[in-house]
């Protein structure tokens, strides 16, 4: 692949990872809460709390939304092409953010870590449940990439010999 005058060679590979994870071998337990104001808040067995601020992420997403809104109101052919480009750019950027955060967590705690996440399956951000929030807040909640972060953390943890456990959000 040629990009900006440089050539890159992509080599796909498969790594066999042991599916078995024994609770007897747990060295660390890390609870992770996902959110918008703070992308993640983690709490480990030593009582150390780590916050990853979502402020810069939120600003950049607002910028993408503003540009998207302006282009949609124009409605020209070139505006539609630009919208397609921006959409891909925002998705790639958000994927990279999730990748970096999950990679940092997994490398920080090493093998034998049990990451505990709240199970957001079935959680709905419908208008009924969101109440009297602004349209901006509703849109932000609906488009946040909670699941993608969970997927990134899960596969990276398993590759390193750790595990992700999902619990009910009530606890």
Name the predicted role of every residue range.
Residues 3-171:
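Positively charged, helix-rich recognition surfaces that bind polyanionic ligands
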């Amino acid at each position: 692949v040629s990009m900006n005058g440089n050539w890159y060679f992509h080599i796909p590979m498969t790594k066999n990872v042991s599916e078995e994870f024994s609770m007897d071998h747990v060295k660390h337990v890390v609870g992770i809460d996902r959110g918008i104001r703070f992308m993640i808040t983690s709490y480990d067995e030593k009582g150390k709390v780590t916050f990853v601020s979502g402020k810069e992420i939120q600003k950049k997403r607002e910028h993408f939304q503003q540009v998207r809104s302006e282009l949609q109101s124009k409605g020209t052919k070139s505006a539609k092409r630009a919208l397609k480009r921006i959409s891909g750019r925002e998705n790639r950027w958000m994927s990279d953010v999730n990748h970096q955060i999950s990679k940092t967590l997994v490398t920080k705690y090493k093998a034998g870590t049990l990451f505990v996440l709240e199970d957001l399956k079935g959680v709905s951000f419908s208008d009924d449940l969101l109440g009297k929030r602004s349209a901006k807040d509703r849109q932000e909640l609906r488009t946040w990439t909670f699941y993608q972060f969970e997927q990134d953390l899960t596969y990276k943890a398993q590759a390193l010999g750790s595990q992700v456990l999902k619990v009910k959000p009530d606890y």
